[in-house]
Swiss-Prot record:
Pfam families registered for this protein in UniProt: CTP_synth_N, GATase
Source taxonomy: Bacteria, Pseudomonadati, Thermodesulfobacteriota, Desulfovibrionia, Desulfovibrionales
Similarity comment: family membership: Belongs to the CTP synthase family.
Protein name: CTP synthase
Residues annotated as domain Glutamine amidotransferase type-1: 297-550
């Protein structure tokens, strides 16, 4: 079957949930037996989000092939249950970079390079490349394209022009436009207001795009008379106006859309096979979430806690661990900068597990180290990820191994004992090459990125969790454990339970005499799915359950 395209745009304001809507539509179509892929196009000028402040962008998601991508790719992977790649995310910066590089090579044969047709053609090429990609050896039946930003943003215009042209290029029967917009409910008036939606659609139509379906983001489901009004003023069929009301948890969204008949409308418009959707796994998932058998409290000690989107995949992975154990996970975020030896008892009173996530820079580091000391001494389940593992190494060095001035080269380049140091080289198995780095390298795209193999030692907590001695996990770091301290740490009770296959890089540490204390250099949250929770998160929450029962 020829690949058909669904384009999703957003209006009125940002953060309405285009990514979740795209992921849920993808899940519905997948449940009907179709092969689906999703792409996010971001209008910002950065090549990728790798160097952006988490407070501005949120989490930077990492794919198997090493792309630093928008957090929406996490939603796509979790809802589709599949791995995506660099092809599934692009930006204005990446598009312009390709066009300018072609111009410098002389590919345009002396033409005046312009937004139309050169930039728009490159955008179309990026979109159409999805139709040529293979998913489990199958060409995708459906490619869902989410356009970042909001209708009316100047930087998004080339993307809108490109998807407008694609309808002519591919045929109307192969393209569907879905517009997600806000329909606010005014309590004082007692009604939903449609004017923002009308103006948003008017703006979209002025560009040349007529939406086929309108998703109405709202606090509560909109009544039929409001749907009829939107249908009239926005020139869409009444049965093509759908509610996207607030829900208790995001995994209910595919079921809500199914109840509304959204997937049926999409398959009808695109003339897709009408195989019945199998949503039993989603129903079982939601039932487990809504009927927990207990609760544990996990404290996340980080530096970006003012915006929980900075830890989106981590949040979801912990919830997946709860699903696997049939319990609710109550997450508490604590700013590491406020943690001291004097208040640590009060901050962690009643918690069942402590997690220190990834991050960069020295701000708040001592608070993280103090949190780890507390977890180690009080036998509270501890999970350190990336920087969290490195902080665990520093804490162990200072307070157990007797290396009082232990530090990371990242925080103190002239430290006497750099137990964490800058990686100068590593083997990239995907490209069969040695990667070289130093402190003068560019910041963007130069870390150890993507999926790398790891060998586990039997009879360790890590091996018990994974039930295998060979795994692959996704990385995003430039600092690593300093091997000259391995023997010294091992003598004091640290176990290096996971390493690179050549044993040169430490990937997982754990403590011998502790109920559950694990640190990993990789990011396991990027490979956790609601239907298949990650082994480490499943085991961490299980350990928290045991602590809760004490």
């Amino acid at each position: 079957m020829k690949t058909k395209f669904i384009f999703i745009t957003g209006g009125v304001l940002s953060s309405l949930g285009k990514g979740l809507s795209a992921a849920s539509i993808g899940a519905l179509l997948t449940s009907r037996g179709m092969t689906v892929t999703i792409q996010k196009l971001d209008p910002y000028i950065n090549i990728d989000p790798g160097t952006m402040n988490p407070y501005q962008h949120g989490e930077v998601y990492v794919t198997d092939d090493g792309a630093e991508a928008d957090l929406d790719l996490g939603h796509y992977e979790r809802f589709l249950g599949t791995s995506l790649s660099q092809k599934n995310n692009s930006t204005s910066g990446a598009i312009y970079y390709k066009v300018i590089s072609k111009e410098r090579r002389g590919d345009y044969l002396g033409a005046t390079v312009q937004v139309i047709p050169h930039i728009t053609d490159e955008i179309k090429s990026t979109i159409l490349s999805l139709a040529k990609s293979s998913i489990d050896n199958n060409t995708p039946d459906i490619a869902i394209i989410e356009i970042g930003g909001t209708i009316g943003d100047i930087e998004g215009l080339p993307f809108l022009e490109a998807i407008r042209q694609l309808q002519t290029d591919l045929g109307r029967q192969n393209c569907l436009y879905i517009h997600l917009t806000l329909v606010p409910y005014l309590g004082t008036a007692g009604e939903h207001k449609t004017k923002p939606t009308q103006h948003s659609v008017k703006e979209l139509r002025s560009i040349g795009i007529q939406p086929n379906i309108i998703l109405c983001r709202c606090e509560k489901p909109i009544p039929d008379d409001i749907k009829a009004k939107i249908s009239l003023f926005c020139d869409v069929e009444k049965d093509a106006v759908f509610s996207a009301a607030d829900i208790n948890n995001i995994y209910e969204l595919p079921l809500k859309f199914y109840t509304e008949g959204l997937d049926q409308k999409i398959t009808s418009f695109l003339n897709l096979p009408t195989k019945q959707a199998n949503l039993k796994p989603w129903e079982q998932l939601v039932n487990t979430i809504n009927n927990p058998k207990g609760k544990v409290t996990i404290t996340i000690v980080g530096k970006y806690v003012g915006l929980t989107e900075a830890y989106k995949s981590l949040h979801e992975a912990l919830c997946h661990g709860g699903i696997a154990n049939e319990i609710t996970v109550d997450l508490q975020y604590v700013n590491s900068e406020i943690i001291t030896e004097d208040n640590v008892n009060e901050i962690f009173k009643g918690v069942d597990g402590i997690l220190v996530p990834g991050g960069f820079g020295s701000r708040g580091i001592e608070g993280k180290i103090e949190s780890i000391r507390y977890a180690r001494q009080k036998n509270i389940p501890f999970f350190g990820i990336c920087l969290g593992m490195q902080c665990a190494v520093i804490e162990f060095a200072r307070n157990v191994a007797g290396i009082e001035k232990a530090n990371s080269e990242e925080f103190n380049p002239v430290a006497a004992d750099k137990v964490i140091y800058l990686m100068k080289e590593w083997y990239d198995f995907r490209n069969n090459a040695i990667e070289y780095r130093d402190s003068l390298c560019d910041k963007g795209g130069t870390m150890r990125l993507g999926s790398y193999p790891c060998t586990l030692i039997k009879n360790t907590k890590a091996f018990k969790a994974y039930q295998t001695d060979s795994i692959e996990e996704r990385h995003r770091h430039r600092y690593e454990f300093n091997n000259i301290y391995r023997d010294q740490f091992a003598e004091k009770g640290m176990i290096f339970s996971g390493t690179s296959p050549d044993n040169t890089l430490v990937e997982i540490i754990e403590l011998l005499n502790h109920p559950w204390f694990i640190g990993c250099q990789f990011h396991p949250e990027f490979k956790s799915y609601p239907m298949k929770p990650h082994p480490l998160f499943k085991d961490f929450i299980h350990a928290a359950c045991n602590h809760n029962k004490q």
